[in-house]
């Protein structure tokens, strides 16, 4: 990949986004073959996997045969959707798709870097907890938030149109159109999301399509919202100088206070916008009036209708007032709460004590939902009483301890920034007893005997890792009043993801 990007300046066709010559480079398919071997695993002998590798001439014949076909192009060889499994296992198609994806990623990498440099204040972080730290710093200064869910039922021609804006290679677009339309014919309308985005056999290509679609949305959406918020100065058309206009407003203080509308005063304040996204979920936080929020909602509906020809369902965007309501994001319950502060200011010999009220964003772990998930996985009953994990009794003692250990460590690190730490330790108690009961059931003994035999080895790894994480972050006294975000976490916790999906379904219904 790096070699293609370094040599891109030497090839004029690449600079003009003509990707078709890349499909006939053997080193490109060598990279694709390397990725294909990594995902195939070691279940098959290496000789069998290597024998399925495509040669240079096979690639040329395959693409030439696709270009010469008329009407609908059948990459499956048969329109029967029941043969989709055999199609996905076809090594030839997999390698063509891998090479096609790598060629597209080469051109898209430079385009995305140019977009990020052009956007002021635009940052792309790897850790998912960077989003939570950013929201704690920025959202308390906002008064409205728009919860947006990006539509994922994408028509293949929409994706082709997106690539056509920066790819001038007609054969490459024809190949992309053939693949996407064949996927659409192989899946029904309800499973279109899986066909285009989350298909397991084509993860690299599916993720690239989704990221390209979201990139196109954000490249138009963010500047559009900024123009909407900054367009409020156009309301003062009769005042060429806004500073002069604000001076005139200050002179109107002689009027009685009850005749001055607070909404009109809000229009004089500079509004700002903050945007975060994870997956299909986006949050647009802004400081402004209710009228500006309605304008943003109106333009968001028409944005997808005119740019992508998609009907934007009303449930996919929800406007909330932060001071009155809470919302869920990344598996957390979040709400803005007022926090009183006492400030002492000393001027010469005088000491002034002032009470200030600030807003802070509190993140809460959904303890009840986590308990429900643990009960569903047979770690406890519906009331939260620990039970033995019978399906794990056939494993070794070390495997049982490691599995319980990983569940607790992942859960503790993910919700380390929540304010309800006591609920997390209650879950730890449930997992600890469930682990002991599982070992007791395996050895046909009691919990007391297991604790006497193992002693400190029971959950020792989790205790040690937890102490290391706490001591490296803060002291014990600071831990009681400060929250810690672990910037090494790169994806959402499975239990948190399950609860977040349930919340999204409730909003949809």
Swiss-Prot record:
Main localization (coarse): plastid
Repeat is among the record's keywords: no
Annotated compartments: Plastid, Chloroplast
Classification via Pfam families: Intron_maturas2, MatK_N
GO cellular component, one term: chloroplast
Gene Ontology MF term list: RNA binding
InterPro entries linked to this entry: Domain_X, Maturase_MatK, Maturase_MatK_N
Keywords: Chloroplast, mRNA processing, Plastid, RNA-binding, tRNA processing
Superkingdom: Eukaryota
Record keyword Chloroplast present: yes
An example Gene Ontology biological process: mRNA processing
Functional description taken from the UniProt entry: Usually encoded in the trnK tRNA gene intron. Probably assists in splicing its own and other chloroplast group II introns.
Family that this chain belongs to: Belongs to the intron maturase 2 family. MatK subfamily.
Protein name: Maturase K
Organism: Chamaecyparis obtusa (Hinoki false-cypress)
């Amino acid at each position: 990949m790096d070699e293609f990007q370094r040599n891109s300046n030497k090839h004029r066709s690449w600079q003009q986004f003509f990707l078709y010559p890349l499909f006939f480079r053997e080193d490109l398919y060598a990279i694709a073959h390397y990725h294909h071997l990594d995902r195939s695993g070691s279940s098959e002998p290496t000789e069998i996997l290597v024998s399925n590798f495509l040669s240079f001439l096979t690639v040329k014949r395959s693409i030439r045969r696709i270009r010469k076909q008329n009407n609908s192009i059948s990459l499956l060889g048969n329109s029967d959707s029941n043969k989709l499994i055999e199609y996905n296992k076809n090594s030839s198609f997999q390698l063509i798709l891998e090479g096609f994806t790598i060629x597209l990623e080469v051109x898209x990498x430079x385009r995305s870097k140019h977009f990020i440099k052009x956007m002021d204040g635009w940052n792309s972080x790897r850790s998912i907890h960077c989003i939570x730290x950013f929201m704690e710093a920025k959202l308390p200064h906002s008064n409205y938030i728009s919860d947006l869910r990006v539509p994922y039922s994408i028509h293949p021609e929409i994706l082709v149109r997106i690539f056509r804006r920066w790819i001038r290679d007609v054969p490459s677009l024809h190949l992309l159109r053939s693949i996407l339309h064949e996927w659409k014919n192989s899946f029904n309308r309800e499973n279109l999301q899986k066909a285009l985005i989350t298909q397991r056999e084509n993860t690299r290509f599916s993720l690239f399509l989704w990221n390209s679609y979201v990139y196109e949305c954000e490249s138009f959406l963010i500047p559009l919202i900024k123009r909407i918020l900054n367009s409020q100065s156009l309301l003062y058309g009769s005042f060429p100088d806004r500073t002069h206009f604000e001076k005139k407003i200050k002179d109107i203080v002689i009027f009685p206070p009850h005749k001055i509308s607070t909404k009109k005063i809000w229009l004089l304040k500079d509004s700002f916008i903050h945007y975060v996204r994870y997956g299909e979920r986006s949050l647009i936080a802004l400081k402004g009036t209710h009228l500006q929020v309605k304008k943003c909602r109106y333009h968001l509906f028409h944005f997808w209708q005119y740019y992508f020809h998609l009907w934007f369902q009303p449930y996919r965007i929800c406007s909330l007032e932060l001071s009155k309501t809470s919302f869920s994001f990344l598996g957390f319950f979040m709400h803005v709460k007022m926090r009183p502060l006492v400030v002492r200011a000393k001027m010469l010999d005088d000491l002034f004590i002032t009470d200030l009220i600030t807003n802070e964003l509190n993140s809460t772990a959904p303890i009840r939902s986590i308990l429900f998930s643990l009960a569903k996985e047979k770690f406890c009953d519906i009331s939260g009483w620990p039970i033995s994990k019978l399906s794990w009794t056939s494993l070794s003692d070390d495997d049982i301890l490691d599995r319980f250990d990983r569940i607790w460590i992942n859960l503790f690190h993910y919700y380390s920034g929540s304010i309800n730490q006591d609920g997390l330790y209650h879950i730890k108690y449930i997992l600890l007893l469930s682990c002991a009961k599982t070992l007791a059931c395996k050895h046909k003994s009691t919990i007391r005997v297991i604790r006497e035999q193992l002693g400190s080895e029971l959950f020792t790894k989790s205790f040690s890792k937890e102490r290391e994480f706490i001591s490296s972050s803060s002291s014990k006294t600071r831990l009681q009043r400060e929250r810690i975000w672990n910037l090494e976490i790169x994806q959402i916790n499975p239990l948190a993801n399950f609860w977040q999906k349930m919340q999204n379904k409730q909003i949809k219904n």
